[in-house]
Amino acid sequence: LIFEYNGVGDSDYYWHIVLGREICQTHSIPTRDTFSWLSDSLGLQETAHSWLGSIILYKLSLINSNPMYGQLIFVFVSAFAYALFVDLAWGKELNDPFENCLFVCLVTALMTWGGRPMNIGILLFAISFYLLNDGYRNSESKKYRLLPIVAIFWANIHGGSLPILFAFNTLFVLMSFLPDVNTFGLVNEREQPTAKARKMGSLLAVNMLAGLLNPYGFKLYYYFFITNNEATKRYVSEWQPCALADPVVFFCIAFLFVIVASRTKIRLTEFLPILCCLLLTSRYVRIRSYLLVVMIPLIFRFLSVMMKEQENRMWKNGGRFTMGFTGKSKFWTIVTSAALVVACCIYAPFIATNPEKTGDKMDAEFVELLHALNPQRMYTSYNCLLYTSDAADD
């Protein structure tokens, strides 16, 4: 209800529903996205790589003014609540969150704060991350064979983010050759490295071939490797480096401190995806959503271990509640909590004064300038800024 009341927060939503409407009305997929001018103004051609995602958003907009929020969150939260009920009622342990990818998808659904094909792509990434882990860790499982199907959907719903699948698939190929490790809280058991590398390598090749099943074929790959370059990202806020004060990034780093303080063993195959996403997030803030996805399995495993240990302490203490942390673990937990409070205090004034957060209207002088320019294609705030800046220079 809160999401429905607030409405769509991302202005890119309107760009995508207009594109989806045009495709539905003309019954044809455009050779290029005529509603995006940034690449075109630089002499590049913007591929409508989110054509299917735009159609989905357009169709949902005919039903609900705020698509993807109520429906997805209700489904995933209900599934999460049901899983917890099963755990409490029948004692089904949740030590391995990869047993059910709904746990991983839950937070990604909560992170979809705007109706965009990219948000659907994040859900596809969560499913892909689950399938990659399942194929890597369970030699008998065949679920990973579904990944090429996910790649096909991904290439058509939000093909511009498909390289993230290839990057993580490559990471799992490289992790197959990791040695045995048991130091600094990181553990890894090397098992059948050649077989794992062959499986993950073959999967990467099939995924790349599956991604070609889109209206543009290999031109889609040319788009996200050549056309969608640094020049096109220069004026876009979500492609800027992330600040440490970002609440999502700070939460992930703080939770890592808590896990390390509790002396919980971390699998190297859990840590490396997190490290890669942290490095990418430091360069592009939009990767923080993927960072949260790869953090969720470790968070669930940590909480499950803590709950089991607390339960054992309570039984030994006659059923009375006892502190979960002691000594250094308790100290680092307090330090992390204090740092989180400090970060919130620092970040709160920015939220309070940020026009994008407060919904403040543009001043009258700026509105008059926009009317004088008579722009034809302005759908986001950074486009407005870039357009007026270019006009002022002229």
PLM segments and residue spans:
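Membrane-interface transmembrane helices that cradle and orient dolichyl/undecaprenyl
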Residues: 128-144, 176, 256-265
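Transmembrane-helix signature of polytopic, membrane-embedded enzymes
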Residues: 85-108
